[in-house]
From Swiss-Prot:
Residues 121-164, 192-247, 249-308, 311-370, 372-425, 447-505, 571-630 form the Collagen-like domain. This is Collagen alpha-1(XXV) chain. It is a single-pass type II membrane protein. Keywords: Amyloid, Collagen, Disease variant, Glycoprotein, Heparin-binding, Hydroxylation, Membrane, Pyrrolidone carboxylic acid, Repeat, Signal-anchor, Transmembrane, Transmembrane helix. It comes from Homo sapiens. Residues 1-33 are cytoplasmic. GO terms for molecular function: amyloid-beta binding; heparin binding; identical protein binding. InterPro entries: Collagen, Collagen_Structural_Proteins. It holds the Pfam family Collagen. Residues 280-290, 361-377, 398-407, 603-626 have a biased composition (Basic and acidic residues). Residues 55-654 are extracellular.
Length: 654
């Protein structure tokens, strides 16, 4: 395929006359897959390198941020730093000891010399008191004055229709005009009934005020209104007494195993862990073969002058490899005569020779220093001596360090009940609008009186457990050397001791005068003295041949533990612990004494307007009004119309 492509691209070139070999054909067939695989591998390698580089940079940045946030760089403890740290620790320990001793020291209270009366200035006004209880209803008041007259009552309803006329209908045509008198007498009868009421007259003058009517019957109670909106949150009330301990509830039913939750989000990066303990030293490796001697290096340039301060001591270097065993050297030249040796050690004592002739008595030599013999055996104890007189009392010793506070002892028995206190002031304070004076009077009433006499001593509680031993204190300064004590009385003479061991030989005495020559004694055996000390070492011989590596040595014993390091600085405050279990309920407290009656509170604000009540019952009918003005004459008065709009029946017949 590749050959065909090249041939196609060449265009004008002539095709190869020779056929490709089988190796070339195989290469041509396998080249594209190999190239693709190599390209993929190279791309994967580049991507992995980039990914690892990014991750490494990210990790280094996080470590640097954590170190800077923690602010705990490595500290190399130098001698100056150790001394400074030691002084700081000592000062801190002394401060803690002084604080503890001051807290546990008995404190003396001095009696007050202030008078029993209160001379304190008035304090600031307190908070607004709670609303007082509702007072009892007062007695009924006196009857009030007569009220003004009420308004005019409503117009009354129309009266019932009156009866018709009872007179028959008469024809008056038979009477002549001359007989008017007779006509009048015949026609006029008795006074008729009152006609229908006339039209309403003009309004009359205002009448005198009427009496106040009686109160109507009490109306029915109104429908309860809608519940009001919840008010603002009030102040927190006083803490109630602790309730009694509830009974132990029944054990709950064990819950079912919950389903596995979704995996949580990755947590925040944790802090650097505490460095692990130092690992144990590994086994000593086998010795390697000695390398060949390298060529000698060039002479180095002269170094800069170093500082005069002593450098840090380097770690001991590794032991060098053993040199090759040298070949035996040629015999050396005879050495120079050695230095005269020191006199040899004294040889063993020879056998005693034959006794010589007695010499003349020499002069007495000076006494040598007394030799210190070995300690003799202890003698038998002497008889018990009489008891000596009691010595004078020594000075009072310094106060020892106070031990730690022991565990609290068991609660003692309850003491007898105290006497009943005096009754508090119960007078009611009327402040009359002056709040400052009322507060001053309350302060005067509630001032604490002088302290009463101390109560009887309670029963002695049981002895507490022995406290743990206190921390050993710092070594005190060395005291002055005391004066030499008086010499004690000589003891009883002990029994004579046994014969002591022979003492050391005394010092050589002065050389005596030469005695007379004695008779020649027999020749004693000749004793050869010990050999003299070895001569000085000769020069080192040439290096021997390289020896075989020795066997692996056994591990050396573990070195001793180093001294304890100085106390570290106080660590940072740890995280907040989880809340502990709920403690048992406390016993109910005693009922408190009733407080003083508070002064009346201020007048409350005006309440909201109530809802409109239901319509009351109809009132009593009012009194009859004054008579109206007389109406018009009956003949001239127009007929009153009925409900149908026509004149009333009988009116038009007049």
């Amino acid at each position: 395929m590749l050959l065909k492509k090249h041939a196609g691209k060449g265009g004008g070139r002539e095709p190869r006359s020779e056929d490709p070999t089988p190796a070339e054909q195989h290469c041509a067939r396998t080249m594209p897959p190999c190239a693709v695989l190599a390209a993929l591998l190279s791309v994967v390698a580049v991507v992995s390198c980039l990914y690892l580089g990014v991750k490494t940079n990210d990790l280094q940045a996080r470590i640097a941020a954590l170190e800077s946030a923690k602010g705990a760089p490595s500290i190399h403890l130098l001698p100056d730093t150790l001394d400074h740290l030691k002084t700081m620790v000592q000062e801190k320990v002394e401060r803690l000891l002084a604080q503890k001793s001051y807290e546990h020291m008995a404190k003396i209270r001095i009696a007050r010399e202030a008078p029993s009366e209160c001379n304190c200035p008035a304090g600031p006004p307190g908070k607004r008191g709670k609303r007082g209880r509702r007072g009892e209803s007062g007695p009924p008041g006196q009857p009030g004055p007569q009220g003004p007259p009420g308004p005019k009552g409503d117009k009354g309803e129309q009266g019932d229709q009156g009866p018709r006329m009872v007179f028959p209908k008469i024809n008056h045509g038979f009477l002549s005009a001359d007989q008017q008198l007779i006509k009048r007498r015949l026609i006029k009868g008795d006074q008729g009934q009152a006609g229908p009421p006339g039209p309403p007259g003009p309004p009359g003058p205002r009448g005198p005020p009427g009496d106040t009517g009686k109160d109507g019957p009490r109306g029915m109670p109104g429908v309860p209104g809608e519940p009001g909106k919840p008010g603002e949150q009030g102040l927190m009330g006083p803490l109630g007494p602790p309730g009694q301990k509830g009974s132990i509830g029944a054990p709950g039913i064990p819950g079912m195993n919950g389903q596995k939750g979704e995996p949580g989000l990755p947590g925040a990066v944790g802090q650097n862990g505490i460095p692990g303990p130092k690992g144990e030293p590994g086994e000593q490796g086998e010795k390697g073969d000695a390398g060949e001697n390298g060529p000698k290096g060039d002479t180095g340039e002269k170094g800069d002058p170093g500082s005069s301060a002593a450098g840090i001591k380097g770690e001991p270097g590794e032991s060098g490899r053993p040199g090759q065993k040298g070949e035996p050297g040629l015999p050396g030249l005879p050495g120079l005569p050695g230095i005269k040796g020191e006199p040899g050690f004294i040889g063993p004592q020879g056998e005693p020779g034959l006794p010589g002739l007695p010499g003349t008595k020499g002069e007495r030599g000076e006494a040598g220093p007394p030799g210190r013999g070995e300690r003799g055996e202890p003698g038998a104890p002497g008889p018990k001596g009489k008891q000596g007189e009691s010595g004078t009392r020594g000075p009072k010793g310094s106060k020892g360090d106070r031990g730690e506070k022991g565990d609290s002892g068991a609660q003692g028995p309850r003491g007898p009940p105290g006497q009943k206190g005096d009754q508090g002031a119960t007078e009611i304070i009327d402040y009359n609008g002056n709040l400052h004076e009322a507060l001053q009077r309350i302060t005067t009433l509630t001032v604490t009186g002088p302290p009463g006499p101390p109560g009887p001593q309670g029963l002695q509680g049981p002895k507490g457990e022995q406290g743990s031993p206190g921390i050993p204190g710092m070594d005190g300064e060395q005291g002055l050397k005391g004066s030499k004590g008086d010499m004690g009385d000589p003891g009883m003479t002990g029994e004579k001791g046994g014969i002591g061991l022979p003492g050391l030989p005394g010092a050589n005495g002065m050389k005596g005068e030469k005695g007379d020559s004695g008779m020649p004694g027999p020749q004693g055996p000749s004793i050869i003295g010990p050999p003299g000390p070895p001569g000085p070492h000769g020069p080192p011989g040439p290096m021997g041949p390289h020896g075989l590596p020795g066997p692996k040595g056994t591990d050396g014993p573990m070195g001793p533990h180093g001294p304890a390091g100085p106390k570290g600085e106080r660590g940072e405050k740890g995280a907040m612990g989880e809340p502990g279990p709920r403690g048992p309920y406390g016993l109910p407290g005693k009922d408190g004494e009733p407080g003083l009656d508070g002064f009346p509170g201020p007048r409350g604000e005006k309440g909201d307007l109530g809802e409109k009540g239901e319509k009351g019952f109809r009132g009593v009918k009012g009194e009859k009004g004054e008579p109206g003005q007389p109406g018009l004459d009956g003949l001239d008065a127009p007929c009153q119309l009925g409900p149908d709009g026509l004149p009333m029946p009988g009116c038009w017949q007049k």
